[in-house]
Amino acid sequence: MAKKVAGQLKLQVKAGSANPSPPIGPALGQRGINIMEFCKAFNAATQEMEKGMPIPVVITYYQDKSFTFAMKQPPVSYWLKKEAKITSGSKTPGKGPKAGTLTKAQIKTIAEAKMKDLNAADIEGAMAMIEGSARAMGLEVVG
């Protein structure tokens, strides 16, 4: 018989840096999930990734206090900032100076990496979504 699902929890955790301090500890603890067990499993699963990369994770926890988790790709904003070599987007997107520039080739690379997490039918649709995110961050898309 399958385990009875008690709920799901969505967190964004830095790769290789899961520890019991906030926000992870309280979020898991109040649901009765073994915090250290999650931290060890998550850190082991992300040890090959770039340390500090934000990873969205969906934790499904069961009534017997066990859990499973699924990791997604880092957010689009992370990829955009990395490709444009900036630390943050523009404070006034669309008005003031541009925070940086990206090429269509860079947008396509990001779209291919994020395709399975995006709600897009094809690569062109995914690129359009990512270009919109780039413009919202004050980045200019050229080429």
UniProtKB/Swiss-Prot annotation:
GO terms for cellular component: cytosolic large ribosomal subunit. The keyword Manganese does not apply. SMART domains: RL11. The keyword rRNA-binding applies. Pfam families: Ribosomal_L11, Ribosomal_L11_N. Keywords: Methylation, Ribonucleoprotein, Ribosomal protein, RNA-binding, rRNA-binding. GO terms for biological process: translation. GO terms for molecular function: large ribosomal subunit rRNA binding; structural constituent of ribosome. SUPFAM superfamilies: Ribosomal L11/L12e N-terminal domain, Ribosomal protein L11, C-terminal domain. CDD domains: Ribosomal_L11 (cd00349). One or more lysine residues are methylated. Part of the ribosomal stalk of the 50S ribosomal subunit. Interacts with L10 and the large rRNA to form the base of the stalk. L10 forms an elongated spine to which L12 dimers bind in a sequential fashion forming a multimeric L10(L12)X complex. PANTHER family: 60S RIBOSOMAL PROTEIN L12, LARGE RIBOSOMAL SUBUNIT PROTEIN UL11M. Belongs to the universal ribosomal protein uL11 family. Forms part of the ribosomal stalk which helps the ribosome interact with GTP-bound translation factors. This is Large ribosomal subunit protein uL11.
